[in-house]
Amino acid sequence: MTVLVLLPGLGGTSELFEPFVAALGSAVATKIIRYPGDAALGYDALAALVRAALPVGEPYVLLGESFSGPIAISLAAEGGAQLRGLVLCCSFARNPRPSLGPLRVLLPLAPIVPRPLGLLSRLLMGRLVTDTLRRSLAQALRQLAARALKARLRAVLSIDVSAELSRVAVPVLYLHATEDRVVPDAALRHIRRIRPEARVVSIPAPHFLLQTRPGEAARAVLGFIRGVVQSD
């Protein structure tokens, strides 16, 4: 059976994948990669961690959510023999907020001031926020040290894997949240310029698409996996 390897968003934990994994059911095997919550690791170090955890001897599809999109792209560009497809969810190939790029040199000095959970929940989940999702978000944030968060934010501000995306040889699916207030539509347009053949599924959802619209996301991903398996 094809394994769907799930690479998490900025928090790096597994809890926020629970609604999506439940919606997938038994239709596909899943493997969730977790990132160390206390280590100041950038994209290269996290990609090495993921590379070492990829399935061996069985086909797999990579799904990079938000922050992890560049990691999924970089690994897909390496052309693993068992890789069958690449899914990007609310993600990007380069810094999605280029106007903030110059601030990366200040991040090591800047204090991390937590935003009120209610405001953060509305930013990430919009009108679809629930108490359960809010608790899951709070749990994920508790596991993330300030130094780890700073390292990941700094990595986002300087990332550009556009060249790697052009070398990806497997089919690409992009899950687009039409109400995303974190990753702008310009990120998708950039990806489509590089990979015009990529399949795009737009879902009326905020940035936390997999959490707030798990059923629709699961149907899109399962349909994509069936397609790449049948064409294999």
Q: Locations of the language-model features?
A:
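Catalytic histidine-centered segment of alpha/beta-hydrolase-like enzymes
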Residues: 205-218
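Short alpha-helix in the alpha/beta-hydrolase fold that links the catalytic acid
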Residues: 170, 184-193
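Conserved HGGG/HGGXW glycine-rich cap/lid loop of the alpha/beta-hydrolase fold
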Residues: 1-40
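Conserved alpha/beta-hydrolase catalytic His-Asp/Glu region
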Residues: 97, 115-166
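Flexible "cap/lid" loop of the alpha/beta hydrolase fold
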Residues: 43, 77, 82-114
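Acidic catalytic loop of the alpha/beta-hydrolase fold
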Residues: 178-183, 208
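Short beta-strand/loop motif that positions the catalytic acidic residue
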Residues: 168, 174-176, 180
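Gly/Ala-rich beta-loop-alpha elbow adjacent to hydrolase catalytic centers
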Residues: 64-68, 72
